[in-house]
């Protein structure tokens, strides 16, 4: 993220900081750092889960508002969609106004984090013209892989939809940032991890947002990137528009993290043939391991049944020995 020139505007607690980005893009990590530094993200937050054991840091009121509007538009509540227009019913607009009024009255620097906000950026911008936005993105192949690991029905039946959703969210993010440069700060997930202090400095310089120092409690095991080097190459070949969108976001954020295979933005020819067969081989090895695991499980089940049968026979013999004489 490029640090903008310092603003003469004093910090205003009534101006919220809204954190959003595509699901599985590091928004929870970013929100946890902001909350630890003093940003009030809500009184009732979504509980931790297996996917986010340290917490989601999502305001339940804002979350339920987004879910309700999505369902009203015929979209799954998770927000997995590429629908270009999402209408907010009039009654829900009044609910949004009430949500904002309640949170503004709490005092201190406030805001919220909720990935689905990305689908409603124009709506919230109209309702909160002074809001500030911290927009985070993550490498598309990492997000897609993370979604697959969650084993959700949406992507299990249509895997390619995962990259479509990533593209839809991040296109909305990029378009909004370009239309509202004074109100937005864009960063890559890797910058949140490696340049946390610089990110906080940028927030202070651009938005006048004064927070405490970021807490150093990042757990690398919760944000691993141990993926096949073939994935970004295959994604670039199959979905060049999505890869180019990622490069545009990197440029806007001033990200300097290494690109796959050490290639610069001006990419060279792809060794697609080698990567296709690499992934084919990996998939075959995975299938063989699954078959071996199934074989071992079946053998263990058979052995367990035999043990249980033997145990039953032993108990029956024991009962016969201790049965009182004369008993029927």
Predicted features along the sequence, with ranges:
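A polyampholytic, Gly/Pro-enriched intrinsically disordered region
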Residues: 66-70, 155-165, 232-241
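PAPS-dependent sulfotransferase catalytic core
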Residues: 1-94, 219, 295-297, 302
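C-terminal lobe/tail of nucleotide-utilizing enzymes
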Residues: 221-274
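The conserved 3'-phosphoadenosine-5'-phosphosulfate
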Residues: 46-53, 179-244
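Boundary detector for helix-to-coil junctions that initiate low-complexity/charged tails
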Residues: 252-328
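A structural signal for well-ordered alpha-helical scaffolds and beta->alpha junctions
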Residues: 27, 55-59, 89, 93, ...
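Residue-level signal for short amphipathic helical patches enriched in basic/charged
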Residues: 25, 128-131, 307-310
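PAPS-dependent sulfotransferase catalytic domain
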Residues: 75, 97-213
